[in-house]
């Protein structure tokens, strides 16, 4: 039995592989033609047009609202409408909601809130559904989707002004503490959407209010803007001695992951948590504004550019070429012919750079010729999440598709200017001067960067250039201040910490932060498309699976689309939430950022993200797991169509899925945040063989995604070896063209790696010690501090009033015998000392 041809090879069959002399020569043209046709097909399959994607805080308003609901919930829209209309007819005669004056609408809402305060769960649920119908835009009285969105926003502001959010917050506390619902869900073999009805209604109302009020528009009246700021303050700070709202949602996430509440609608919880954090702390553009303000407060020079605008102006690069596998090597001309071509061509060219010389040395040599290393399993350094879930697959990586590049030497065309201003750190200048002084004068001057005596003129010019591009980050200032506070705690006094929303959130999360991070990563792992179904993994489909499983094929297809969409939305919310937390904590204080980062790394976040990208990212980004006719608000205006193959396949004609591309970019940004300037974590990227995984993501022609992939490749380039750099020159050129340069950063060569053995464990331990010292100094307030003043006056101490517990007099004689009479006391010496 003949072995099947290797996947992706273009070699001829057994009779044309070179065996048998003349037969092989006769079959060569056919084999070459077959290889060319296969190559054309593969080029067409991987060709991706430039994606017109605009990165932002979130998707469009309608899309963000529609993702709140699963398609299984669509039948509940009519249920909400019926509950509202039944209640409305008993209170208002002969009018519809939109016909009422604002005062009458407010009076009706007050009546609804009063009717929520009943003992019966069924009656309470009906009234809550009526409130949800208002928040959904009273779609029964609207003619278009625009009207539904308009009245949804109007009603949400009205509901907030009447105190609906605080009322629903109390109901949410009751449902979270409802032990009967938890025990009922635990007893069931399979939890379905029916087990979380009350929670889904409450969370939906709260999400609609947060999302609609969060959205700012120029036409908003003054009252709405005031209400928005008041709402933001209520969500940010502890009200009535209660924790901030985000902490309540975090506790729901941990309770769900611990298995104590499997019926929680986790998608709605995560969406609401993400939007609350974004609303209270600010989105990505607001972060840039805060960064500019903070630099001005610290007396630092302004930023050289706005990173968001620079990325938006970038153009996507063509993906690098890939291996042509066995077919190319079989059909390539003999080396002697190549040498002849190379020699004749060199006679015509007098000046060539090293890249052109390298390309001409072997015209058929494309990137990644040695695929043995990259085709090894990405799970060689296999890790587990909480000891139960594999984080790296053991299946071999899929070989890269054939090259798109023509079989000729290519020249790399660089733009006129690089997009980023180069940066230099203070320690880079110190390191440069240390090497220069050792070379020219034989000794060093420590951290002195001003004394240049004895150094040649070119070194003077180099130092001048380095200082012109010196960049002092906010983190550098914060670390320096922290070192001074550790050295001189008494003389510098107590640090004044402003009570910002970010600071309050960190204080609330501090002691449970490891559990929060592990819970989020567990859910992210369960939602990743590369995850394998396991019996011991958490069930994230409780709020999407119907009570009765589908019977027909079409119903199964619909549920399959719904489940995939459900997972995509969870990935989107978690990735954006983690990125927002990291960026805000980094701006607030660098050690807050490092604390969160370290717990993410300890929970195996790095291999988890790499596992996510160990799939066909192009297919994931272009996946169409949506049914447009079932999306809100479209499904509320039109009658639900009969389930057919056409209605399932009917959807938007966009070339990509916004949320999936958004998730991929955020996960790459998250990975970049965790590994930047951390050699131990960069080595994790190398150990887990991330280079081929990341490089395949470059096939997606979107500038921002490519930028963060190239950043991650740049981090580990020096560790990948000379052969990898030689065979990936186009990737190296793309890094040079798109990623910011650090002067005297030897990223492309790695000459000093062997001379610099990193103690990775010591690096993380030192960072952890600094974090613990920061948290202890700022947030631990022990009563008997070593820095608190001591009262040495005997009379003063004896005269102090000491509050004793009420039951102390029962054991007073025993205490007197044990602590006073049985202890030898030299009274003369005691009196002499005082």
UniProtKB/Swiss-Prot annotation:
Keywords on record: Cytoplasm, Phosphoprotein
Any one GO biological process: cell migration
Region (Disordered): 1-48, 321-345, 360-382
Modified residues (Phosphoserine): 318, 329, 354
Acidic residues: compositionally biased ranges: 369-379
Basic and acidic residues bias locations: 30-43
Role: Plays a role in the regulation of cell morphology and cytoskeletal organization. Required in the control of cell shape. Calmodulin-binding scaffolding protein which is the center of the striatin-interacting phosphatase and kinase (STRIPAK) complexes. STRIPAK complexes have critical roles in protein (de)phosphorylation and are regulators of multiple signaling pathways including Hippo, MAPK, nuclear receptor and cytoskeleton remodeling.
Family of this protein: Belongs to the STRIP family.
UniProt-recorded name of the protein: Striatin-interacting protein 2
Organism: Homo sapiens
């Amino acid at each position: 039995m003949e072995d099947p041809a290797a996947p992706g090879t273009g070699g001829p069959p057994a009779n044309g592989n070179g065996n048998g002399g003349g037969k092989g020569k006769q079959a060569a043209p056919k084999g070459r033609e077959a290889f060319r046709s296969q190559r054309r097909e593969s080029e067409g399959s991987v060709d991706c047009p430039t994606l017109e994607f605009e990165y932002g805080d979130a998707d469009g308003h309608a899309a963000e609202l529609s993702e709140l609901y699963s398609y299984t919930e669509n039948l509940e829209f009519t249920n909400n409408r019926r509950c509202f209309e039944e209640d409305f007819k008993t209170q208002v005669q002969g009018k519809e909601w939109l016909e009422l004056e604002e005062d009458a609408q407010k009076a009706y809402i007050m009546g609804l809130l009063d009717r929520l305060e009943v003992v019966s769960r069924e009656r309470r649920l009906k009234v809550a559904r009526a409130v949800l119908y208002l928040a959904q835009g009273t779609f029964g009285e609207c003619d278009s989707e625009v009207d539904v969105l308009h009245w949804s926003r109007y009603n949400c502001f009205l509901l907030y002004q009447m105190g609906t959010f605080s009322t629903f917050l109390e109901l949410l506390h009751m449902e979270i503490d409802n032990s009967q619902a938890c025990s009922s869900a635990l007893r069931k073999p399979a939890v379905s959407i029916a087990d979380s009805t009350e929670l889904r209604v409450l969370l939906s109302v709260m999400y609609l209010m947060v999302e609609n009020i969060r959205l700012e528009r120029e036409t908003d009246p003054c009252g709405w803007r005031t209400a928005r700021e008041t709402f933001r303050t209520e969500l940010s700070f502890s009200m009535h001695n209660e924790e901030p709202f985000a902490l309540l949602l975090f506790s729901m996430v941990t309770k769900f992951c611990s298995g104590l509440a499997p019926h929680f609608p986790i998608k709605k919880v995560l969406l609401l948590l993400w939007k609350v954090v974004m609303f209270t702390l600010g989105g990505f553009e607001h972060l840039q504004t805060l960064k500019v303000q903070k630099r001005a407060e610290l007396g630092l020079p302004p930023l050289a550019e706005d990173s968001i605008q620079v990325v938006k102006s970038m153009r996507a690069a063509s993906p690098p070429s890939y291996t042509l596998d066995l077919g190319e090597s079989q059909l390539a001309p003999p080396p002697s012919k190549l040498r002849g071509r190379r020699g004749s061509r060199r006679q015509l060219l007098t000046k060539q750079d090293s890249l052109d010389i390298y390309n001409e040395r072997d015209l058929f040599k494309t990137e990644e010729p040695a695929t043995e290393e990259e085709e090894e399993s990405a799970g060689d350094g296999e890790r587990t999440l909480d000891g139960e879930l594999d984080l790296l697959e053991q299946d071999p990586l899929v070989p890269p598709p054939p090259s798109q590049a023509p079989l000729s030497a290519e020249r790399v065309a660089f733009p006129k200017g690089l997009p980023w201003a180069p940066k230099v750190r203070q320690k880079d200048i110190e390191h440069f001067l240390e090497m220069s002084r050792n070379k020219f004068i034989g000794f060093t001057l420590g951290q002195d960067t001003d004394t240049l005596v004895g150094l040649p003129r070119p070194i003077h010019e180099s130092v001048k250039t380095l200082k012109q591009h010196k960049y002092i980050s906010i983190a550098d200032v914060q670390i320096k201040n922290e070192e001074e506070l550790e050295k001189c705690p008494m003389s510098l006094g107590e640090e004044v910490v402003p009570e910002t929303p970010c600071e309050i959130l960190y204080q609330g999360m501090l002691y449970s932060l490891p559990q929060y991070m592990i819970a989020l990563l567990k859910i992210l792992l369960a939602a990743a498309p590369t995850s394998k179904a396991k019996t011991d993994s958490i069930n994230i489909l409780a709020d999407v699976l119907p009570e009765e499983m589908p019977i027909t094929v079409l119903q199964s297809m619909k549920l399959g689309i719904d489940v995939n969409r459900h997972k995509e939305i969870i990935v989107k919310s978690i990735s954006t939430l983690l990125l927002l937390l990291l960026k805000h904590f980094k701006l607030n204080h660098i050690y807050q950022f490092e604390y969160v980062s370290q717990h993410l790394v300890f929970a195996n976040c790095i291999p988890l993200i790499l596992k996510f990208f160990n799939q066909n990212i192009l297919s994931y980004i272009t996946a169409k797991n949506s049914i447009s006719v079932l999306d809100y608000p479209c499904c509320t205006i039109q009658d639900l169509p009969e389930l057919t193959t056409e209605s399932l396949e009917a959807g938007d004609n966009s070339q990509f899925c916004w949320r999936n591309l958004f998730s991929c970019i955020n996960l790459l940004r998250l990975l970049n945040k965790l590994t930047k300037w951390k050699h131990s974590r960069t080595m994790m990227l190398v150990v887990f063989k991330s280079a081929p995984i990341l490089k395949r993501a470059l096939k997606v022609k979107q500038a921002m995604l490519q930028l963060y992939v190239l950043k991650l490749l740049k981090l580990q380039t020096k560790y990948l070896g000379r052969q990898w750099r030689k065979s990936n020159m186009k990737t190296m050129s793309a890094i040079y063209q798109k990623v910011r340069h650090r002067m005297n950063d030897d990223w492309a060569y790695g000459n000093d790696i062997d001379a610099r053995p990193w103690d990775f464990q010591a690096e993380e331990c030192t960072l952890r010690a600094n974090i613990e010292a920061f948290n202890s100094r700022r947030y631990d307030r022990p009563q008997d501090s070593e820095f608190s003043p001591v009262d040495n006056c005997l009379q003063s101490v004896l005269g102090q009033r000491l509050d004793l517990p009420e039951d102390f007099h029962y054991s007073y004689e025993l205490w007197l015998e044990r602590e006073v009479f049985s202890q030898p006391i030299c009274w003369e010496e005691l009196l002499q000392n005082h």
